[in-house]
Each structure stands twice: as structure tokens, then as C-alpha cells.
């Protein structure tokens, strides 16, 4: 059974382990450098009151996914940026759907009007996930250079609240 709840400081190390496994696997995130729990904790607390973080946990309270929304300098104030990460080997089990139910409600409560997702064009699973949640394509970034020098295209998707 998967439960979703707001992320707390004690989740940061587990979230970092989950994210680092995704980064090491490659191919789905634009992140290329491993993160620490302290890095994520800093990001969780560095918001302007317009961010929210949720974790999905199994029956043993182990983090199996997490999602956040936050404002972003490149977006208008009524838009939030979203990021979703599910444990390697656990995709397609409804974890992302449960996370988005909580995140969507929080985004509305925070006053956002729409949510932006930047997805690598070669991340088929991510594209399918956001499409299945009702996100619509609205743009594309060609030739995005990631921190490791790799060049990818990004699909921009939008969810109107």
C-alpha cells in the first residue's frame, strides 16, 4: 500500500538515494550530478512559501517516490515548475498518480493557475506520465545542454488548474 504525505526533513536522505539511483541510471532526468540529503533539504527550505514537496511511502514508511512544485524565475508568477521521481523499478504502479493528486490540490491552494513540466524528449516514461495526468504540449527546447555536456531536446508540457 502506498501513502502520500508532505515531505519532512527526515525524508531528505531517502529522497537523495532514490534520486541518485535515477541519475546514475541516466536517460530520464536532466540532472547529472548526484545530490545529498542536505542538498534536497536546502532546496526544500529555500522556497518563498510557494513550494510544496510530497513523498510516496510504502507500508514500511520507505520513500518510493517524491514530487515537488515551486516557482521558477523563467515562469510567470501564476505558474509552478514540477518535478517527479519514482524509485527505479517501481514506475507504472500508480505512485506518480497518487503524488500528483496531492500536488495538484496543493498547487491550487498556493494560488497557482498552471503547472509546467520540462521533460527530456527521450524520456518516454516521463512524457507518458505527464500526458496521462492531463498535461498538454505547449513548446519545445531544442539542443538543451545538460551539466555534463550532453545535448538533449526538452518537451514543455502544461497543466491548467
Question: Residue locations for each model-derived region?
Answer:
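A short beta-loop-alpha structural element at the N-terminal edge
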Residues: 3-15
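Amphipathic alpha-helical recognition patches that constitute DNA-binding helices
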Residues: 14, 81, 125
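Hydrophobic pocket/interface hotspot
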Residues: 15, 19, 40
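Terminal substrate-recognition subdomain of acyl/acetyltransferases
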Residues: 84, 148-161
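Conserved acetyl-CoA-binding loop-helix of GNAT-fold acetyltransferases
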Residues: 92-109, 128-132
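Conserved GNAT acetyl-CoA-binding A-motif
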Residues: 107-119
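Conserved catalytic-core motifs of GNAT/GCN5-like acyltransferases
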Residues: 116-120, 131, 136-153
